């Protein structure tokens, strides 16, 4: 089979062998063809060049290293030699751990196409040598079962596919295997991984389906739909497309019907984004692929309805999606909390997939407006600038309880970043007939085909820091063609293509476009593109200028969390206030002016890059990010309840850059109405105390910050927890500056049931320290309530002490946590 190149790392449409091309055309593929990322070379020492190089030098090697140290390869080694002695549930925490190597191989394969590397290629081969022997003779490859077939992982079920619609992830594993295998084949020409994936896919096609003797199940976690479309395009074998369509057609018609996995109703009847946000976006992307390849417009109508629901009611200003950690899910319409926003990194990537495919279907710039907003904000915030730290959720407000991690037990986000960033060049251009779409603005050199003839373009720009872009025609064999330049929504006065957000400052930005220094007769068409149709010559230069200045944004008043607040953006970048730049006052207590005035500044990347990544430091040497400063007020109550104000200078940084310099306060939405402000209050007795814990916990300051949940289901404020410790006795102590008389204490317990790992304690008690330094239980305690999210008050006989201790017993199978602990 002839070796080919991917159109885009994550696009359904690919450049295929001749036989597959014929199948694709007759099946009605996407009307717009993306330019392969291998045909677009992003320049080094630029905004995205730094990110891609960082992925190559740090993120992908780190992911492979973690696969070694965290036992991912060991699962395959044990599966090659099954044994009843293996306790799979302990040896393999999650049934989808196999996907970490698959996704990292995929990302590494994209890197290989741009940066050939014999050592990396050999390493991937060595990993495949570990994976291959774990495959069963009939093609089944699922180490959560194969390690110990008689006693598999507790999520696997007693037989194949029996828990697929619940938690087994057998088809999810297949999906990532196929995506990685196709990428590896196209990067190297080797069928080593592809043949493994084809054997597993053939096993699935034989055993899963609507026919007698088959398991009539659909993926519990979607992605196989996208992957099987990609395998169909790579091989020309229609059975894979038919299986993908079966997964969609039967969703909502099998035994499990729940919003969590979008199986609550048939997909063609769905019109609202619900449930697990990553599952949802992967399904919507799969629907677009199947629609494009089969010509079934009913899928397109369904996706259009769902997309409209997302952008008009469920999209964060950062482009993130997923409002709640309860099921990692979309919230209700207009439910967009900030501190508890989930906005999973994988969901941001999924949001890019969906908008990308809808552009390929419809050709309208509004989809790239959403894609760009997600890309520059809610997606790249998920990985540190040095490539070595990751966010799982990406909240829009923090009090120090959030920090990037080098890895996670559930490592879907780091490995997803591995495969996404190297594919970014494939999102820049697209072609339809004799039109070239310029969708993203980044410095690059490209080679594309227009009507089968070669065209070479390059871009030179400092975007997103300024709005000047030079597009040069380096070669043109196609003669006349249309260059369609996207005019971003932020230039046209529309943050998103709905009324969910709007600019509140009354400004009107403009733009100019010239060819070889002269204005041209062109205009913005209904699709949102400025189209210049001419016979292009080598050396022609199109200069684009977008006005770029700070803008204030308000949310639809139905978004309760953002009422009375503004967010601030400049170009495609959303800004935030963070503690390191605003020393000496609490950014949580600020009040914006009615007409803010912003000054632009620059901030060095020094301090944002971990010094241990020396190979990355040089990429950012001499580089700066754009900052904004403005005058604001801080509000504070004194002990008598009198409100005072103080003028301050507030510095704002790009949202993606937060949490690189230690833990502390961060805020995207800033109060502009007094009723939305949160004045600081005098320190409570607990806030004055030295706080110590029995073992390390996150967000230590949260239990003395004065914030309490609104009700038993409110998880929008910070909390501490002892997860993953279980069945232990834990304690917290307050030591006061001097002896105090206390007689009552209030605790707000954190409990994230039924989904999470925390419950209220089995029991708890209070102790005080006597003059001899001994701990004694407080006398006369009336009760020790254990209710979640409400005030659990215990009254006792007054005691005078310098220290008090809360001691609790964790349940056998769960951890404990609490929002607040006060004493009076």
Describe the residue ranges of each PLM region.
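Predominantly extracellular/luminal regions of secreted and cell-surface proteins
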Residues: 679-713
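Aromatic (Trp/Tyr) and acidic
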Residues: 22-118, 122, 152-187, 222-239, ...
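C-terminal beta-rich recognition modules with glycine/proline-rich loops and embedded aromatic residues
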Residues: 244, 303, 369-377, 382-472, ...
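Asp-box/WD-like beta-propeller blade repeats and closely related beta-sheet repeat scaffolds
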Residues: 147-168, 194, 199-215
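Short, surface-exposed beta-strand/strand-loop-strand elements in extracellular ectodomains
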Residues: 172, 496-505, 510-515, 755-772
């Amino acid at each position: 089979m002839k070796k080919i190149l991917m159109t885009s790392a994550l696009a359904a449409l690919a450049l295929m062998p001749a036989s597959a091309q014929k199948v694709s055309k007759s099946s009605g593929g996407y009307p717009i063809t993306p330019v392969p990322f291998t045909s677009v070379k992003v320049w080094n020492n630029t905004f995205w060049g730094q990110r891609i190089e960082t992925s190559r030098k740090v993120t992908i090697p780190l992911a492979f290293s973690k696969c070694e140290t965290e036992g991912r390869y060991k699962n395959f080694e044990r599966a090659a030699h099954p044994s009843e002695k293996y306790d799979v549930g302990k040896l393999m925490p999650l049934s989808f751990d196999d996907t970490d190597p698959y996704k990292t191989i995929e990302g590494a394969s994209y890197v290989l196409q741009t940066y050939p590397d014999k050592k990396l290629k050999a390493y991937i081969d060595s990993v495949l040598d570990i994976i291959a022997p774990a495959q069963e003779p009939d093609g089944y490859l699922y180490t959560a079962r194969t390690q110990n077939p008689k006693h598999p992982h507790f999520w696997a079920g007693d037989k194949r596919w029996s828990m697929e619609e619940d938690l087994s992830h057998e088809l999810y594993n297949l999906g990532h295997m196929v995506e990685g295998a196709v990428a590896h084949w196209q990067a190297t020409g080797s069928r080593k991984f592809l043949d493994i994936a084809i054997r597993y896919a053939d096993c699935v096609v034989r055993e899963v389906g609507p026919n007698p003797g088959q398991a009539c199940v659909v993926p519990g976690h979607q992605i196989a739909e996208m992957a099987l479309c990609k395998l169909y395009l790579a091989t020309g074998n229609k059975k894979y497309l038919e299986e993908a369509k079966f997964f969609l057609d039967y969703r909502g018609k099998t035994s499990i019907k729940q919003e969590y996995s979008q199986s609550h109703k048939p997909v063609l009847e769905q019109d609202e984004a619900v449930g697990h946000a990553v599952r949802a976006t992967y399904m919507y992307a799969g629907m677009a692929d199947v629609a494009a390849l089969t010509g079934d417009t009913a899928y397109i109508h369904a996706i259009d309805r769902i997309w409209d629901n997302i952008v008009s009611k469920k999209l964060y200003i950062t482009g993130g999606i997923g409002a709640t950690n309860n099921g990692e899910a979309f919230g209700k319409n207009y439910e967009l909390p900030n501190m508890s926003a989930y906005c999973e990194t994988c969901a941001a990537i999924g949001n890019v997939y969906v908008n990308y495919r809808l552009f390929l279907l419809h050709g309208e710039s509004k989809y790239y407006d959403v894609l760009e907003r997600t890309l520059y904000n809610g997606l790249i915030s998920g990985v540190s600038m040095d490539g070595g730290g990751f966010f799982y959720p990406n909240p829009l407000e923090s009090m120090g309880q959030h920090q990037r991690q080098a890895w996670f037990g559930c490592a879907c986000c780091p490995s997803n970043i591995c495969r996404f960033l190297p594919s970014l060049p494939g999102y820049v251009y697209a072609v339809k007939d004799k039109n070239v779409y310029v969708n993203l603005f980044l410095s690059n050199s490209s080679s594309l085909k227009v009507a089968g003839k070669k065209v070479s373009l390059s871009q030179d720009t400092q975007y997103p820091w300024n709005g000047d872009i030079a597009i040069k025609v380096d070669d043109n064999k196609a003669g006349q063609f249309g260059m369609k330049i996207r005019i971003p929504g932020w230039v046209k006065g529309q943050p998103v293509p709905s009324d969910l957000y709007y600019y509140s400052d009354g400004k009107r930005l403009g733009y100019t476009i010239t060819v070889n220094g002269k204005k041209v007769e062109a205009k913005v068409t209904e699709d949102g593109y400025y189209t210049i149709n001419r016979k292009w010559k080598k050396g022609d230069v199109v200069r684009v200028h977008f006005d770029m200045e700070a803008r204030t944004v308000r949310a639809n008043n139905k978004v309760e969390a953002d009422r009375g607040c503004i967010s601030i953006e400049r170009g495609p970048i959303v800004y935030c206030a963070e503690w390191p730049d605003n020393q000496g006052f609490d950014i949580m207590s600020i009040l914006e002016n009615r007409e803010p005035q912003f000054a632009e500044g620059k901030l060095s990347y020094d301090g944002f890059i971990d010094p241990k990544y020396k190979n990355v430091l040089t990429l950012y040497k001499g580089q700066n990010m754009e900052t904004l400063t403005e005058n604001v007020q801080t509000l504070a109550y004194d002990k008598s309840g009198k409100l005072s104000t103080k003028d301050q200078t507030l510095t704002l940084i790009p949202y993606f850059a937060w949490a690189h310099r230690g833990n502390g306060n961060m805020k995207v939405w800033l109060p502009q109405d007094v009723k939305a402000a949160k004045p600081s209050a005098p320190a409570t007795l607990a806030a004055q105390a030295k706080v110590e814990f029995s073992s390390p916990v996150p967000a230590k300051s949260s239990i003395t910050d004065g914030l309490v949940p609104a009700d038993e289901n409110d998880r929008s404020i910070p909390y501490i927890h002892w997860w993953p410790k279980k069945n232990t006795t834990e304690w917290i102590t307050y030591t006061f500056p001097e002896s105090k008389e206390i007689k009552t204490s209030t605790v707000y317990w954190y409990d994230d049931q039924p989904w999470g790992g925390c419950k209220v304690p089995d029991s708890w008690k209070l102790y005080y320290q006597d003059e001899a330094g001994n701990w004694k239980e407080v006398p006369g305690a009336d009760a020790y309530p254990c209710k979640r999210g409400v005030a659990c008050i215990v009254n006792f006989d007054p005691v005078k002490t310098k220290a008090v201790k809360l001691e609790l017993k964790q349940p056998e199978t769960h951890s404990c946590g609490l929002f607040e602990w006060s004493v009076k």
